[in-house]
Amino acid sequence: AQPDYAPQEYGLGAVLKPDPYNVTVRKATEHRIARTFGTERKIAEYLQSLNLPDSSVITDTVYGFGILAASPRPRVFVIPSDPDFTELLNDPSANGIRYLLAVPPIGRGTSDALNLRYPTLYNTGADVATLELEVPNDGDGQPDWRLYRVNERVVTR
């Protein structure tokens, strides 16, 4: 893996092959990249503290894989590989989804399923959710996160 094309995978070298006496530029780069997931770990910890039921948070794994990997309860998340992902994303309030975890619709974020379904989600909540938490990312080349609480469905009579 090359740091310009697959930075997360490149950084795994620091985790999978630790070598504290290696002071090469490559090892330093691996360590810098591996540290980039501190923000994602904090988001996972925050969501864990909410004691959410399974399938409560929708996110895409384009960037969200670090959060899932850090979560002690990955079943809290609905991700694109889940068979009901599209159904839940299309109507989150009717399907018990409580949060949408969004990244900016720029760079790799343009391919994020939430941004494709709700192009204004990151900026406005797309009329389906309300901004609850904004998390600036201190990681190398990683996006800032926004956690949106899904709006309750309005019942008309």
Q: Can you say where each PLM-predicted feature lies in the sequence?
A:
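Membrane-proximal, lumen/periplasm-facing interface regions of secretory-pathway glyco-
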Residues: A1-Y46, G64-F65
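Short periplasmic/luminal acceptor-recognition loop of GT-C membrane glycosyltransferases, typified by
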Residues: H31-R75, Y99
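Short amphipathic alpha-helical segments and helix-helix/interface helices
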Residues: A44-Q48, L88-N90, Y118-Y122
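Extracellular/periplasmic catalytic domains that process cell-envelope and extracellular macromolecules
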Residues: N51, A69, D91-N95, G141
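Solvent-exposed loop/turn segments at secondary-structure junctions
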Residues: Y63-F65, D82-D84, P105-G109
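Alpha-helical scaffolding within the catalytic cores
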Residues: S81-P92
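Aromatic/acidic, Gly/Pro-rich catalytic loop(s) in extracytoplasmic/lumenal soluble domains
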Residues: N95-R157
